[in-house]
A protein has these predicted regions:
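Generic hydrophobic alpha-helical scaffold/packing signal
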Residues: 220-223, 311, 345, 372, ...
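Conserved GNAT acetyl-CoA-binding A-motif
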Residues: 96-114, 350-360
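Conserved acetyl-CoA-binding loop-helix of GNAT-fold acetyltransferases
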Residues: 80-91, 332-346
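Active-site/acyl-donor-binding loops of N-acyltransferases
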Residues: 5-8, 18, 31-32, 119-160, ...
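A conserved beta-strand-loop-helix scaffold within acyl/acetyltransferase catalytic domains
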Residues: 3-64, 113, 135-146, 156-331
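A short, internal acetyl-CoA/4′-phosphopantetheine-binding micro-motif in the GNAT/acyltransferase core
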Residues: 71-80, 158, 325-334, 362
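Catalytic phosphate/metal-binding cores of nucleic-acid and nucleotide-processing enzymes, i.e., regions
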Residues: 69-71, 313
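Flexible, glycine- and charge-enriched loops at secondary-structure boundaries
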Residues: 78-79, 116-123, 166, 212, ...
Length: 411
């Protein structure tokens, strides 16, 4: 049994056999990390020359040595193989000049229903394995410490088809998606030379929500590394087309109202038809308001296809991932993100991928998490990851460097 480096091809071959895996543990991500200045190694724990555990280990220089990290890994088929892997990894890190080794496992610590109620026991044995080997745990957290959340909202896609996808959404989600699709929103996959459009959306959103956006160069490199396994999607709306659709639908409604009025002339005491007339008349008035809004949009934007929102979706054999997104608040009433989500789930079905990961939520279930509320429309469930573990091959050296940095005001 030994820890060794392996080829990209051998890593990918093994990675495709495991049941749970993030896109972060992929050859595509390794390529992206390398292009972003990291030193990347494909490492494996082998038994009788067969890979039992594998991971992408990336490194960056820091004061006093290397920062080494395994994010969303390692990958394995048998849990029993994790302990010897983690134990040997400590020696490997020390021998290769690491001052800090960080591991963020992808194992699920606990599962919850869509509302945040536990549906499984806490899987403490995963943590115990690392702690008993001397790895320090940052603790179980909520929110997005370091920009990454340990709480994911996911949806199992097995058994769901294009025909019954809408039915699988929540009680609120079904009408939300139906309404969003009624506006005439078009979806487009961006080419590399169009990624500034995506960057504009995410910049607007990050400014509004006060978080650090990725650079255009990052998105371009992501596009290059992932190729057909990533979709940079935008949702657009032509307000001339939107207005025409409103007139058409209002015309159909007017015919229904006219028929009801004639029926009520014959049978004026029909409570059912009176209620229908009230409902249809209210809908007719709503169309008038929407047409007025549409005219204002036409005055402002003319006949162009206006971008409402955008999302980056990533595909792996085990799961697809909703990674980055943004929208323009001016167009919130068109619910474009819901149309993008439906597209992603349809694409997940088309590619035969068994799980869709909406990624981060805060892990706070008091109603304050608007991101969670949006994702709940699609009727998934919640998984909690274990968080971050750290090992310091030379703890005194690390503490001394940290103290010096603090004294110099660089911490």
């Amino acid at each position: 049994m030994t820890l060794t480096t392996i080829s990209k091809e051998e890593f990918t071959s093994f990675a495709n056999t495991v049941s749970h895996r993030s896109f972060i543990q992929s050859a595509e991500m390794a390529d992206l990390l390398e292009k972003r200045g990291n030193t990347v190694q494909f490492i494996a724990w082998k038994q009788e020359d067969q890979v039992q555990v594998a991971a992408i280990l990336y490194s960056l220089p820091m004061t006093g040595g290397l920062h080494m990290e395994i994010n969303s890994g390692p990958l394995y088929q048998e849990e029993a193989m994790l302990e010897p892997f983690y134990a040997t990894l400590k020696d490997y890190a020390k021998e290769n000049g690491a001052i800090e080794l960080v591991i963020k496992p992808y194992d699920t610590y606990q599962t919850f229903d869509s509302d945040g109620n536990p549906t499984s026991e806490e899987q403490t044995h995963f943590m115990d394995t690392l702690k008993n080997l001397g790895y320090q745990h940052d603790g179980l957290t909520t929110g997005y410490p370091g920009g990454e959340g340990d709480w994911h909202y996911v949806k199992d896609m097995e058994g769901i088809t294009e025909k019954n996808l809408l039915k699988s959404f929540s009680k609120k989600g079904k009408p939300l998606v139906k309404k969003a699709k009624s506006f005439g929103i078009e979806l487009k996959r961006l080419n590399r030379d169009e990624l500034q459009l995506f960057k504009d959306i995410t910049s607007s959103t990050s400014d509004r929500r006060d978080y650090q956006d990725k650079t255009l160069d990052y998105y371009q490199t992501f596009y290059d590394s992932f190729g057909d396994n990533a979709d940079f999607m935008i949702a657009t709306l032509n307000f001339h087309y939107y207005y025409t659709n409103l007139e058409k639908d209002q015309g159909k409604l007017a015919q229904k109202i006219e028929k009801l009025q004639k029926d009520l002339e014959v049978n004026p005491n029909s409570e059912k038809k009176q209620n229908q007339l009230r409902e249809f008349s209210s809908q007719f008035d709503t169309f008038e308001v929407r047409k007025k809004d549409a005219k204002e949009y036409i005055e402002k934007y003319g006949d162009q296809d206006v971008i409402l929102a955008g999302s980056l979706f990533v595909y792996m054999p085990q799961e697809s991932t909703y990674l980055f997104s943004g929208s323009y608040t001016e167009f919130n009433k068109f619910y474009a993100p819901a149309v993008l989500q439906e597209y992603m789930m349809l694409e997940t079905i088309k590619r035969g991928i068994p799980r869709y990961n909406f990624l981060g939520i805060q892990g706070i279930f008091d109603g304050s998490d608007g991101v969670l509320r949006f994702k709940q429309n699609f009727n998934g469930y919640i998984v909690r990851k274990m968080g971050t573990f750290r090992y310091y091959p030379s703890p005194l050296k690390y503490k001394l460097i940290s103290l010096i940095k603090k004294l110099l005001g660089r911490s």
